[in-house]
Amino acid sequence: MFASIKDILENPILNSNVTINGWIRTKRSNGKIGFIEINDGSTLKGIQAVINEEENQFDEKDLKNLTTGASISLTGLLVESPAKGQNYEIKTCGFNVIGEADPKTYPLQKKRHTFEFLREIPHLRIRTNTFGAVARVRSKISYKIHEYFQKNGFFYINTPIITSNDGEGAGEMFRVSTLKFNKPNNDLGNIDFKDDFFGKEAFLSVTGQLHGEAYAMALSKIYTFGPTFRAENSNTTRHASEFWMIEPEMAFYKLNDNITLAEDLLKYLLSSILNECSQDMDFLENYIEKGLIKKLENVINSNFEVITYTKAIEILESSKKNFEIKPYWGIDLQTEHERFLTEETFKKPVVVIDYPKNFKAFYMKINKDNKTVKGMDVLVPKIGEIIGGSEREDNLQKLENRIKELNLSIEHLNWYLDLRRFGSTPHSGFGLGLERFVQYSTGISNIRDSIPFPRTPKNLYF
């Protein structure tokens, strides 16, 4: 049995024999004494192993195979290190190079590589300090999401990835089909999906919300956490075609309850990573985004400002800021507008509510003015919207009217209307995109670097 490098560094037993397994990050030598840094991914910093050829007999071939990227199993004595920047090192007694790495072709050498280059080798970029740190923080966030909801009486449910519904009504969906590409059309010139696998048109899910609402109508508080897909042709630093969503749905929750939950969740997650990922967060602060920790602490220590969409537009219109897209009532807020509100006006997170219904989803509850809906967007400095949600329409007739108004299919949504026919109740929910939250938490500027294998337009490695 061997220990992880993290365990050894956190619980050192000096002058004891230890065995570690990992990959060589760096190698240097001073005559007959060699120094290699080994990392196993359990922690940001690896551990230095000293190989003294004068004290031990090592196979010449094995010594030549000690190259950057090679995997190794090494045994030695854990001692205090006289070198600066490290507390411990291993005096090597023996080692075995498990997997060689040719230094002439291994793409990750001891230098800083650009993010653009690393995106071309997503299967290897995880071996860098930056992507290792991001991966550990992402893992911690995922764990803490489950912890938060479980502690607060929520039930975790799995919603379908293949669906016949467009949960957002936007039409930006990936079709799932087993039909041959040359299948003939029907008499109307359309593809006949009766012969398809499911006997109807099927898509990859854009949200688990609608199915989540069904379970909230019985379990009261649920959350989903899974992959979602958007066929949105957006080549930006904030959009991906495949991403993970956290979507809680709560029966008997009004909009204000929804806002309170969203704020509490964000603060819980940010506090957790600052407390439990301090080494990785310090690295990201130093090398990725100066002021990162202060930015996150500002969110944790702030009371989120809640304003209406109408008030937000008034603030934007009265400002002297020269926006690329001029704000006016009826336009969806752009990132530049959201950042102005959070960074220059309030200097803290802002929750914008009561959006015009004309650009919001069909399921949002319409306000008494019949012009706005009980929607909410949580905006944070530097990135803008990070959470989107609403109180859901619980009135059957109003929901039917809204579906017809938007020319959506009553037939496809009849099951969803059943939730209003039988024991309807006020209920709310929201969505938090994991990748965008990882972006914000780590300072990574491009969403392609916050997910292991990004899927974006014209980009599908592996």
Curated annotation (Swiss-Prot):
What is the protein name given in its UniProt record? Asparagine--tRNA ligase
Looking at the keywords, is Protein biosynthesis present? Answer: yes
- Location of this chain's protein in the cell: Cytoplasm
Query: Does the keyword Aminoacyl-tRNA synthetase belong to this entry?
Result: yes
List, alphabetically, the InterPro entries matched. Aa-tRNA-synt_II, aa-tRNA-synth_II, aa-tRNA-synth_II/BPL/LPL, Asn-tRNA-ligase, Asp/Asn-tRNA-synth_IIb, NA-bd_OB-fold, NA-bd_OB_tRNA
What superkingdom does the record give?
Bacteria
Catalytic activity field: tRNA(Asn) + L-asparagine + ATP = L-asparaginyl-tRNA(Asn) + AMP + diphosphate + H(+)
The EC number on file is: 6.1.1.22
Q: How does it assemble?
A: Homodimer.
Gene3D superfamilies, per database record? Bira Bifunctional Protein, Domain 2 (3.30.930.10), Nucleic acid-binding proteins (2.40.50.140)
Q: Extract one GO BP annotation from the record.
A: asparaginyl-tRNA aminoacylation
Keyword annotations for this protein, in alphabetical order, are: Aminoacyl-tRNA synthetase, ATP-binding, Cytoplasm, Ligase, Nucleotide-binding, Protein biosynthesis
Q: Which GO terms describe its molecular function?
A: asparagine-tRNA ligase activity; ATP binding; nucleic acid binding
Name of a matching Pfam family? tRNA-synt_2
Q: Which GO terms describe its cellular component?
A: cytoplasm
Q: Which SUPFAM superfamilies match?
A: Class II aaRS and biotin synthetases, Nucleic acid-binding proteins
UniProt family annotation:
Belongs to the class-II aminoacyl-tRNA synthetase family.
Q: What is its main location?
A: cytoplasm
